[in-house]
Amino acid sequence: MAAITAGLVKELRDKTGAGMMDCKSALTETNGDIEAAIDWLRKKGLAKAAKKAGRVAAEGLVAVESSGHYAAAIEVNAETDFVARNPDFQAFVREAAKVALNTDGTVEAVAAAKFPGESVTVAERLTALIATIGENMTLRRSAKLSVSAGVIASYVHGAVVEGQGRIGVLVALESTGDVEKLSTLGRQIAMHIAALNPLALDASGISEETIAREKAILLEKHQGKPANVQDKIAESGIKSFFKEVTLLDQAFVHDGSKSVSQVLKEAEGQVGAPLKLTGFVRFALGEGIEKEETDFAAEVAAAAGQS
């Protein structure tokens, strides 16, 4: 049998990110064959991940990463908020965000891409991390923005480490104007988006289903009134709804007397060039994930009964 040296264990750990004891076990089981040990670890990781796959993962981190005229945001979920403080988890999230910058930014492309510095994909690296940390984790979503000129500003709310927290926002400002002033404005708008959570840039981005649902709610409130009156109420109500949920029509959080579109128009004079907000991304951790209600006392009792 081949000698399992510390150097061999370190080499396997560097390639896979698996724990030292798992690496030693893998090498022992495969008689020191690195490639076979990698396969052994993958199978073990897949088995562990499969056991945890049904568990709700609504905690974790949202991260933003930027480079020049490109920026990306991702959300990686875990079961508990303790994992967000884990350096290995944070490192994975950071590297996955960098991968998003070098792909088309979709979560499928990120998952399939090679993990930086390793021979495995991002998805395979996450599987190994699940086996190491012991919680279910998911690469939930990813997005990428770009500008031909201008800036992509970012903001992270509830930051745990730099660029990673509970809410991540990107804002694309297309302009040939002063970059420093654009960056300041972009960050203010990013903070606005984090606070007010617009559904879309403007009315054209609101789905017909959402509009129909809002109209139905308005009509239900005014049942019994003449049809023409109901129609006017619904029309007025939808306009008010757009002002509440579309970014360009919202009252600017830093100056409620102006809409975001007015702020952008006025800023053109300050930056010295035409200015257009072309897109934004807002990821809030666990948004839309139904969390399980757990009875802690019952959970402890059940665990004690199994031991």
Curated annotation (Swiss-Prot):
Belongs to the EF-Ts family. This is Elongation factor Ts. Associates with the EF-Tu.GDP complex and induces the exchange of GDP to GTP. It remains bound to the aminoacyl-tRNA.EF-Tu.GTP complex up to the GTP hydrolysis stage on the ribosome. Keywords: Cytoplasm, Elongation factor, Protein biosynthesis. It comes from Xanthobacter autotrophicus (strain ATCC BAA-1158 / Py2). The keyword rRNA-binding does not apply. GO terms for molecular function: translation elongation factor activity. The keyword Cytoplasm applies. Disulfide bonds: none annotated. It comes from the Bacteria. It is found in: Cytoplasm. Its main location: cytoplasm.
